[in-house]
UniProtKB/Swiss-Prot annotation:
It comes from Salmonella paratyphi B (strain ATCC BAA-1250 / SPB7). The gene is metE. It catalyses: 5-methyltetrahydropteroyltri-L-glutamate + L-homocysteine = tetrahydropteroyltri-L-glutamate + L-methionine. L-homocysteine binds at I431, G432, S433, E484, D599. NCBIfam families: met_syn_B12ind, PRK05222.1. Binds 1 zinc ion per subunit. This is 5-methyltetrahydropteroyltriglutamate--homocysteine methyltransferase. The lineage of its organism: Bacteria, Pseudomonadati, Pseudomonadota, Gammaproteobacteria, Enterobacterales. Zn(2+) binds at H641, C643, E665, C726. It is an enzyme of class 2 (transferase). Its EC number is 2.1.1.14. Pathway: Amino-acid biosynthesis; L-methionine biosynthesis via de novo pathway; L-methionine from L-homocysteine (MetE route): step 1/1. GO terms for molecular function: 5-methyltetrahydropteroyltriglutamate-homocysteine S-methyltransferase activity; zinc ion binding.
Amino acid sequence: MTILTHTLGFPRVGLRRELKKAQESYWAGNSTREALLAVGRELRARHWEQQKQAGIDLLPVGDFAWYDHVLTTSLLLGNVPARHQNNDGSVDIDTLFRIGRGRAPTGEPAAAAEMTKWFNTNYHYIVPEFSKGQQFRLTWTQLLEEVDEALALGHKIKPVLLGPVTYLWLGKVKGEPFDRLTLLKDILPVYQHVLAELAKRGIEWVQIDEPALVLELPQAWLDAFKPAYDALAGQVKLLLTTYFEGVTPNLDTIIALPVQGLHVDLIHGKDDVAELHQRLPVDWLLSAGLINGRNVWRADLTEKYAQINAIVGKRALWVASSCSLLHSPIDLSVETRLDTEVKSWFAFALQKCGELALLRDALNSGETAALEEWSAPIQARRHSRRVHNAAVEKRLAAITAQDSQRENPYEVRAEAQRARFKLPAWPTTTIGSFPQTTEIRGLRLDFKKGNLDANNYRTGIAEHIKQAIIEQERLGLDVLVHGEAERNDMVEYFGEHLDGFVFTQNGWVQSYGSRCVKPPVVIGDISRPAPITVEWAKYAQSLTDKPVKGMLTGPVTILCWSFPREDVTRETIAKQIALALRDEVADLEAAGIGIIQIDEPALREGLPLRRSDWDAYLEWGVEAFRINAAVAKDETQIHTHMCYCEFNDIMDSIAALDADVITIETSRSDMELLESFEAFDYPNEIGPGVYDIHSPNVPSVEWIEALLKKAAQRIPAQRLWVNPDCGLKTRGWPETRAALANMVKAAHNLRQAK
């Protein structure tokens, strides 16, 4: 039985972020829909050919998305919220963009659908909305069109579909409450239709993704898989695909399904290959996810060979990435600034395809010399001086319980802070960043390229900070920010100023829609050689009598939004970052900054997928935040910010952070998230986001007032702040001014109504 290679998906955006640029040009009205569609076709063709040339036998088709693959599935099923529908009931690419962004070049603007994290990754999806009695039909044939494209190019392919049970699991009920699982019978005919169309095209295998099978699902959801897959069986071979965790706890459910193969993530799960081989039906194909799709490290192929070789020849076997390569940068070969040693430690998406080909060839032939040669740099890295810092390791070992305790409880601190800042009721602020204009990006780029000297660069940044302060004072905001003109990204900026990180030139990965990030890579022990944010915070504070927040990204978020080391625990990395940023808090305080925000938007996304593993993670995640913050004096107000979060199941840990103020993203959920804080009787101050910064729509004063009144029904008004959902980096100044003016007006109206 010959072993084949395949990937579960490939990065969509293009090496130079071509998709992002085409999307944003189209949204701005600067290019046509036909031009956008042409870029998509070009990228798909390029990526299929690149994977094929790298040694992939079965190419994924259907992994491309114009915004995200869950939203693509919603359109496939005809699941379009009424507010986003075309008048004639048709579905087009602008329908998709209205759901994701709230507006598109055609159609009426409407509130964007909710967005949240894809399992425990830094990728996002648009949450499907379900209503009682909803009807589904095949309305969006993107998958079938792309299959036709790939077949016309002569490729051997494997279409990719998000499975029906996981799709329902990922959604939310809107309107009258009901059990969304009852809709399963209604969406299955659409899946049957799609599979029939694929069978007509001669497709042998379809990858059907059911990552919900790695979760601790309620029994009713587990029971739903059998009738669902009974309905889907018989038209094509189905590769039931899971990732991000192991499947062993749900294996009894899986082996009862009428599918022909199973993909397992052997990187992030604890599944034993021998046990899987023993328990799976003998005629099933096993797809072994041996290459990490979520990191940038070169694989130890000798280790992977040993892990799987015992079952070679005993059942049909494919080797694959652990998950979609969407979460990895595209191509290491274009990284010209990484030094030779560090570069030899990495593998990006195309190199991971090459790793799969090397592994396939060795498993088919029994010849392992090429694997040993490939794996040699990994052995060298374990002993590199760039990895280990004795001073950092000593400081980490010396942490005590006192290092994570503020001097006094919140009630005492709040009195000191009220006396210091004398803020009005309903205090207004923003989350941190202001629009990253063409001028700001050009300034940073010129400096990075050496076209601008340090003095002129600093003068330019200072001017943008000054303008941000002027804008905020004109708007009447109560607590200001410096706007972060000097920062390219909230994680990358800190990584650039901390030892232990390296950076890529083109290591872009998709976050959501057209938003791409370039995560830093943790290659060694982390320390802070010098202050990072103090100079600009101090300068901004010198321009105004109002308080200016110091802005830090928290340790867990820096960890989650970086590519971490694989040779130490995540806890170790987080606490090393916390110690480095603890020194930054002390320096900001000494410079006269009285309010310091430590953003932890990723705290919840870092949760293990299985609830039974949560406690250990939350214990060290909370401790890392507290180590970071606890050096602050009582009169220094510590803020934190979180987004895309469901809080009700981690409220104990949110409270344990002991931040004086927490700002959260709530507008897309219509203040629904505040239920968690109300039920828990959260004791500290809260700033529920009053408008969605991911949409260019400007909220009205009345809309914001209504949300704040709804918030005040759950949280005492004296503990409420008024702020947007998130930072304003991706917005333009006209809409930012208009939205903030309405926000400030709404706060003033509520003060007068007291």
